[in-house]
Amino acid sequence: MKLCVTVLSLLVLAAAFCSPALSAPMGSDPPTSCCFSYTARKLPRNFVVDYYETSSLCSQPAVVFQTKRGKQVCADPSETWVQEYVNDLELN
């Protein structure tokens, strides 16, 4: 019985010292969102209020536009209209 209590105590202690934050190297946080497809059509400029670029860890680059209604739309960063919207949002 003493052996079981000792082993259980050691397991609890070991679990207490293990931290999920230590399981991955610093700076290796997974991306919060990635795009796997792009919108097929140009968004009306007056619908777009903000944007962000996806992480370089994603399989393909993308610009994510936030609309007035709170939707997020993935767009191809090589498209001319996407670059124009990004520049416009940066200036404002």
Curated annotation (Swiss-Prot):
Induction details: Up-regulated in SIV or SHIV infected monkeys with decreased CD4+ T-cell count.
Q: Which GO terms describe its biological process?
A: antimicrobial humoral immune response mediated by antimicrobial peptide; chemokine-mediated signaling pathway; eosinophil chemotaxis; inflammatory response; positive regulation of cell migration
Regarding tissue, the record states: Detected in peripheral blood mononuclear cells and lymph nodes.
UniProt KW Secreted keyword: yes
What's the name of its gene?
CCL4
CDD domains associated with the record:
Chemokine_CC
Q: Look up and give the organism this protein is from.
A: Macaca mulatta (Rhesus macaque)
Described purpose of this protein according to its UniProt entry: Monokine with inflammatory and chemokinetic properties.
Q: PROSITE patterns from the xrefs?
A: SMALL_CYTOKINES_CC
Describe its partners and assembly state: Homodimer. Interacts with CCR5.
| Compartments it resides in | Secreted
Gene Ontology molecular functions: CCR chemokine receptor binding; chemokine activity
Which residue positions does the secretion signal occupy? 1-23
Kindly state which keywords UniProt assigns to this record, in alphabetical order: Chemotaxis, Cytokine, Disulfide bond, Inflammatory response, Secreted, Signal
Q: List the disulfide bonds.
A: C34-C58, C35-C74
Q: Name one GO cellular component term.
A: extracellular space
Q: Which family does it belong to?
A: Belongs to the intercrine beta (chemokine CC) family.
Show the InterPro entries listed in the entry. Chemokine_b/g/d (IPR039809), Chemokine_CC_CS (IPR000827), Chemokine_IL8-like_dom (IPR001811), Interleukin_8-like_sf (IPR036048)
**Name of the protein described by the UniProt record:** C-C motif chemokine 4
The answer to keyword Signal applying to this record is yes
Q: What is its main location?
A: secreted
